[in-house]
UniProtKB/Swiss-Prot annotation:
Catalyzes the transfer of the diacylglyceryl group from phosphatidylglycerol to the sulfhydryl group of the N-terminal cysteine of a prolipoprotein, the first step in the formation of mature lipoproteins. Disulfide bonds: none annotated. PANTHER family: PHOSPHATIDYLGLYCEROL--PROLIPOPROTEIN DIACYLGLYCERYL TRANSFERASE, PROLIPOPROTEIN DIACYLGLYCERYL TRANSFERASE. Its EC number is 2.5.1.145. GO terms for molecular function: phosphatidylglycerol-prolipoprotein diacylglyceryl transferase activity. This is Phosphatidylglycerol--prolipoprotein diacylglyceryl transferase. The chain crosses the membrane at residues 17-37, 57-77, 89-109, 118-138, 173-193, 201-221, 237-257. Keywords: Cell inner membrane, Cell membrane, Membrane, Transferase, Transmembrane, Transmembrane helix. One of its GO terms (biological process) is lipoprotein biosynthetic process. Its main location: membrane. It comes from Bordetella avium (strain 197N).
Length: 264
């Protein structure tokens, strides 16, 4: 059994300015996306996208993540509460974001961006998909440093006591599982897969399948939200949202493979 290390929530102090670890992780996430995006454009893997296009895409994607993530949390996790307290939807500083909602927000941004550029949606999504996992990993590291989103009780040797959980039960460090699978492993998989020419849409399909599968598996070790618990079939909300994500990616992968095989 391991003891959760108590981190100072402030990573860096610059006079009166305090930079928190969680905010620093978000900055790192977008820095990863920007630097890797520039690299892909330089390698000719961004079609006719320019560095300016990348900057615009990141800026609007941030808005999509924040707005979509917040609305996704409201609709997927606490619709009844926010129906009674609608003004609190805007209270972002109180926490409450959904990855799946943020993904929907980014998809809408990419649809509008592709239309503006006069290119296909998959030109944009295939370009951006390999850039996302390291950003996701940075976010999960921020969750771990904050001591939040801990796992279910476990007797494994690396199980960890999270004082913020309100008990002294050793638990899965599920944030680190997600950092490893949804961050590092998925990044390596997509970076390798996208390094060679693929049918349009297949890199996006691999992202949907990879994230959906990894998130579904890790949810078996992650403590369910206390206000929801487990839902139908003994699955968590995260699993129910990840299942259609995986299946959608699988269907897209098969369709793009068939379409490619028919082309001379």
């Amino acid at each position: 059994m391991l003891q959760f290390p108590q981190f100072d929530p402030v990573a860096l102090r610059l006079g009166p300015l305090a930079i928190h670890w969680y905010g620093l992780m978000y900055l790192l996430a977008f820095a990863f996306v920007y630097l890797l995006g520039r690299y892909r454009i330089k390698r000719g893997q961004g079609g006719n996208l320019t560095y300016k296009d990348l900057e615009d895409l990141i800026f609007y994607s941030v808005l999509g993540v924040v707005l979509g993530g917040r609305l996704g949390y409201v609709l997927f996790y606490k619709p009844g509460y926010y129906l009674s307290h609608p003004l609190e939807i805007a209270f972002l500083w109180e926490g409450g974001m959904s990855f799946h909602g943020g993904l929907i927000g980014v998809i809408l941004v990419m649809l509008l961006f592709a239309r503006k550029k006069g290119v296909s949606f998959f030109t944009i999504s295939d370009f951006i998909a390999p850039l996302i996992p390291l950003g996701l990993g940075a976010g999960r590291l921020g969750n771990f440093i904050n001591g939040e989103l801990w796992g279910r009780p476990s007797d494994l040797p690396w199980a960890m006591v999270f004082p913020q959980s309100g008990s002294m039960l050793p638990r899965h460090p599920s944030q680190l599982y997600e950092l490893g699978l949804e961050g590092l492993v998925l990044f390596a998989l997509l970076w390798w897969f996208s390094s060679k020419p693929r049918p349009s849409g297949q890199v996006s399909a691999m992202f949907l399948m990879g994230y959906g599968a990894f998130r579904f598996l890790v949810e078996f070790t992650r403590e369910p939200d206390n206000f929801l618990g487990l839902l139908a079939g003994g699955m968590s909300m995260g699993q129910w949202l990840s299942l259609p994500m995986f299946l959608g990616g699988l269907v897209l992968f098969v369709l793009t493979a068939r379409r490619s095989s028919r082309q001379p």
